């Protein structure tokens, strides 16, 4: 983040960003400028936040415009970042620093996830050619990333932060000597009209002038600000031998014929290892490459047809050469915010350079040991060891004490098993041997024999019941015929007597004391009652009440009336503990059926 005297961005850049971001309704806008203190490095220039807000703290009047609120929120986020940085950098406690750190309008708990992303981005720096901003400046073309939260960290170094902030679309394009980055939480397909709209809004504002205190700082050419590319002429070539002992990399050179016919050597490598990396400290400023820009007469159009796939491949290849893992930087920033470390720099490569030189120290990429292998080994170790943690007790060898306990419990179990077998042997009469297999075999055979006996008894009982019912039916038919004949005779006699006898004389029914018209058969709990008597009104209900009073539960009732007789058959069962005898049932029914 550019601070102090090395600030290379104008004061009105935030307002230009605010107008552009609000117009396209994206979440934020960041301008990455080339560092004045570390050439070849992109750092935070300025930014504008336009996303969701969790807590708003302001001491201004309520009628402040929304535009001013957005600028105020962006400024509060910048002050919060500076206060957190100052609080860590001055642990000894300068009173001025402490007062400034405590004056921040926001605190970390007031921020949303998107604001956290915007805040942490202030601590990022990029080598030219590294990450999305560095790749956009290196290739001179915009980079549109639609899957920011799931992108590879080698391509998008802030993918972890983007995932936490639900950020989906990030766009970077070179502009005004730096890189302009815009992002949103919505998924937006690639549309160059968005980039053109942002550029147009910037051009409508006052002209952009770069303010820098370094006299030896050269302006970086923006290839998208003009219709054609302007080649960079190398007026002083590298020495054929390097005092640092590093191998000299070959370069591609083309010849260019000027209007005056002069031939010069030009290089189309806008960004390469010569810019993003460093030459050894022994080289002074006179050994460095001096670059100049030509005018309109010296322009030559380069081939603009570059594949986006190749560009992303170059970004990934360059990101593989980074000396530090992205997660280390993320952890460093978070630990700084929570006051557990004093580091806010991306890595040691930005601390080991010569402050008197304009270049950082160059390191061969092959000698850099990346942390990717270590991370892969750690992931594999976790995947293999975590599932085995639940089976730790099974894998650990038993101690002598545990072995003794197991043996004792096994001995007790065997003793109980032997006792059960001996009990079983005493119950089964046909067991002749005492071994366990013989006991089990004899037990199985004995149980099968018992099952056969039960089946035989059940079949015998069913046959006996069937025979009893058949016998009762046979006895029932002749009795019915005799009783009907006698009843007919009695009726004829009764009719004859009715003619001779006066109406005031009672008729003789002739059924009192007859026991042949009542039969009671009992088999176990089942009782069958067969009754024939003279019919009168309500006699059936009286008979059923008597049966119920004798603790008999009626299951089926068959009744018929004819010629003044009631024929009744009741199948019932005894209920309860008090069982009525056949004599009691017969006496009770006779009192009801043959009332004179």
UniProtKB/Swiss-Prot annotation:
One matching Pfam family: bHLH-MYC_N
InterPro entries named in the record: bHLH-TF_ACT-like_plant (IPR054502), bHLH_dom (IPR011598), HLH_DNA-bd_sf (IPR036638), MYC/MYB_N (IPR025610)
Biological process annotations from GO: epidermal cell fate specification; jasmonic acid mediated signaling pathway; regulation of DNA-templated transcription; trichome differentiation
One GO CC term, this protein: nucleus
Residues covered by the bHLH domain: 401-450
Reported tissue expression: Ubiquitous with higher levels in buds and flowers. Specifically localized in developing root hair cells. Expressed in epidermal root hair cells (trichoblasts) and moves to root hairless cells (atrichoblasts) by a cell-to-cell movement through plasmodesmata (at protein level).
Keywords for the protein's UniProt record, in alphabetical order: Activator, Developmental protein, DNA-binding, Nucleus, Transcription, Transcription regulation
Tagged with keyword Transit peptide: no
Upregulating conditions: By UV treatment. Negatively regulated by MYB66/WER, GL3 and BHLH2 in the developing non-hair cells, and positively regulated by CPC and TRY in the developing hair cells.
Residues forming coiled coils: none
Record has Chloroplast as a keyword: no
GO function term, MF aspect, one: DNA binding
Location(s), subcellular: Nucleus
UniProt function note: Transcription activator, when associated with MYB75/PAP1, MYB90/PAP2 or TT2. Involved in epidermal cell fate specification. Negatively regulates stomata formation but promotes trichome formation. Together with MYB66/WER, promotes the formation of non-hair cells in root epidermis cells in the N position. Whereas together with CPC, promotes the formation of hair cells in root epidermis cells in the H position by inhibiting non-hair cell formation. Also seems to play a role in the activation of anthocyanin biosynthesis, probably together with MYB75/PAP1. Involved in seed mucilage production.
Subunit structure: Efficient DNA binding requires dimerization with another bHLH protein. Homodimer and heterodimer with GL3. Interacts with CPC, MYB0/GL1, MYB5, MYB23, MYB113, MYB114, MYB75/PAP1, MYB90/PAP2, TT2, TRY, TTG1 and MYB66/WER.
Record protein name field: Transcription factor EGL1
Native organism: Arabidopsis thaliana (Mouse-ear cress)
Lineage: Eukaryota, Viridiplantae, Streptophyta, Embryophyta, Tracheophyta
């Amino acid at each position: 983040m550019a601070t102090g005297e090395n600030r290379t961005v104008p004061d009105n850049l935030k307002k230009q960003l605010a107008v552009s971001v609000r117009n396209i309704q994206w979440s934020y806008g960041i301008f990455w400028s080339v560092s004045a203190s570390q050439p070849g490095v992109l750092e935070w220039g300025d930014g504008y936040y336009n996303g969701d807000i969790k807590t708003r703290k302001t001491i201004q009047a309520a009628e402040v415009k929304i535009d001013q609120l957005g600028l105020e929120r962006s400024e509060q986020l910048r002050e919060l970042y500076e206060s957190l940085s100052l609080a860590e950098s001055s642990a000894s406690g300068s009173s001025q620093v402490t007062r400034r750190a405590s004056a921040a309008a926001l605190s970390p708990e007031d921020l949303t996830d998107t604001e956290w992303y915007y805040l942490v981005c202030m601590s990022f720096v990029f080598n030219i050619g590294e990450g999305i901003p560095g790749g956009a400046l290196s290739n001179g073309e915009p980079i549109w990333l639609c899957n920011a939260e799931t992108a590879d960290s080698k391509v998008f170094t802030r993918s972890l932060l983007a995932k936490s902030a639900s950020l989906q679309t990030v766009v970077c394009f070179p502009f005004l000597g730096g890189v302009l980055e815009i992002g949103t939480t919505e998924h937006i397909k690639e549309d160059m009209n968005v980039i053109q709209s942002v550029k147009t809004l910037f051009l409508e504002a006052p002209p952009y002038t770069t303010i820098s205190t370094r006299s030896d700082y050269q302006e970086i050419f923006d290839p998208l600000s003009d219709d054609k590319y302007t080649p960079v002429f190398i007026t002083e070539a590298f020495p054929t031998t390097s005092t640092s002992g590093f191998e000299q990399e070959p370069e591609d050179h083309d010849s260019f014929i000027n209007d005056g016919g002069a031939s010069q050597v030009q290089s189309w490598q806008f960004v390469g290892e010569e810019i993003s990396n460093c030459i050894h400290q022994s080289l002074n400023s006179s050994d460095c490459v001096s670059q100049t820009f030509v005018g309109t007469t010296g322009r030559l159009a380069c081939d603009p047809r570059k594949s986006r796939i190749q560009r992303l491949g170059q970004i990934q290849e360059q990101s593989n050469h980074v000396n530090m893992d992205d997660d280390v930087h993320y952890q460093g920033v978070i630990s700084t915010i929570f006051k557990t470390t004093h580091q806010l720099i991306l890595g040691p490569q930005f601390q080991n350079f010569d402050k008197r030189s304009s270049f950082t120290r160059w390191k061969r990429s092959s000698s850099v040991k990346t942390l990717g292998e270590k991370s892969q080994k750690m992931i594999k170790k976790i995947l293999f060891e975590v599932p085995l943690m639940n089976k730790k007790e099974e894998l650990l060898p038993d101690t002598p004490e545990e072995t003794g306990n197991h043996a004792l419990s096994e001995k007790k179990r065997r003793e109980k098993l032997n006792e059960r077998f001996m009990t079983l042997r005493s119950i089964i009469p046909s067991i002749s041997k005492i071994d366990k297999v013989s006991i089990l075999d004899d037990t199985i055979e004995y149980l099968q024999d018992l099952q056969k006996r039960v089946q035989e008894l059940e079949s015998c009982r069913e046959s006996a019941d069937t025979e009893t019912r058949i016998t009762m039916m046979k006895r029932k038919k002749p009795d019915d015929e005799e009783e009907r004949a006698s009843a007919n005779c009695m009726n004829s006699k009764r009719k004859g007597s009715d003619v001779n006898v006066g109406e005031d004389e009672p008729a003789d029914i002739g059924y009192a004391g007859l026991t042949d018209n009542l039969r009671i058969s009992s088999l176990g709990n089942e009782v069958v009652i067969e009754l024939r008597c003279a019919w009168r009104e309500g006699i059936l209900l009286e008979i059923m009440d008597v049966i119920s009073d004798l603790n008999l539960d009626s299951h089926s009732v068959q009744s018929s009336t004819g010629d003044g007789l009631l024929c009744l058959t009741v199948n019932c069962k005894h209920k309860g503990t008090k069982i009525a005898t056949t004599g009691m049932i017969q006496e009770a029914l006779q009192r009801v059926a043959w009332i004179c």
